[in-house]
Amino acid sequence: MKIDNTIAAVVTGGASGLGRASAQALAAAGVKVAIFDISEEAGEALASEIGGIFCNVDIMSEESCEAGFAKARAAHGQERVVVHCAVVASGGKTVGFDKSTGDYKRAPTAGIETAALGIFVASYRVASIAALGMANAATLNDDDERGCIILTSSAASQDGQIGQVAYGGGKGAVNSMVLPMARDLMDLGIRVNAILPGTFATPPMLGVKEHAPAVFAGLEASVPFPKRLGKPEEFGSLVMELVRNAYFNGQLIRLDGAIRMPPK
């Protein structure tokens, strides 16, 4: 897909971290970007910075997502690129010892349900709403391409650590969705891929650096090469290549400095 100012994009979770870097990279290439997030102040500030628009969208709500896409399309036209970075999840060991009660307890099923809704279902919701809009749009090139959907999974989907049954399982479900969705949409000229980031210098991880520098140093040392956390702009760079290169379809791409996560 040719990337220029004729293209519109939606980036969920776009107010911070990997979503922010994706929005910045797309906007720098002239793309009209709509930022979906619940962090209104940060989202509005970034939209002003990159010349995009902000839509206060809760990915857990069908109505909120539908309204966000409607607002984005009214401003920029049909989106041809969707980068889904937003996530709602929880953690906890399947069964662990509770010091407060002196007994074992299991992670509540509600946490698994939250992850299923906030990761897998939300990814489907965003992707399917976008695909429905793209299906009615004109083709963009000789490949008859209509759009590109990029989902965000995680290295935890393949190397889930202790306490990541809900998160790793949810991201694993996203992985399993990519190829069948790409096949569902192939006749419409819509591509679907997922990025599996490792440990990146996003706001939560930078918080670890501030409050537990030794732990942060250990995280950096655990990456084979380069021995540091990933830079959000490196994620944004891969997003741009996935948009640009039409032969990327139905793929899970790890972006992790060759790390394989240990149990904890």
Place the predicted regions along the sequence by residue.
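C-terminal substrate-recognition "lid" of short-chain dehydrogenase/reductases
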Residues: 228-255, 260
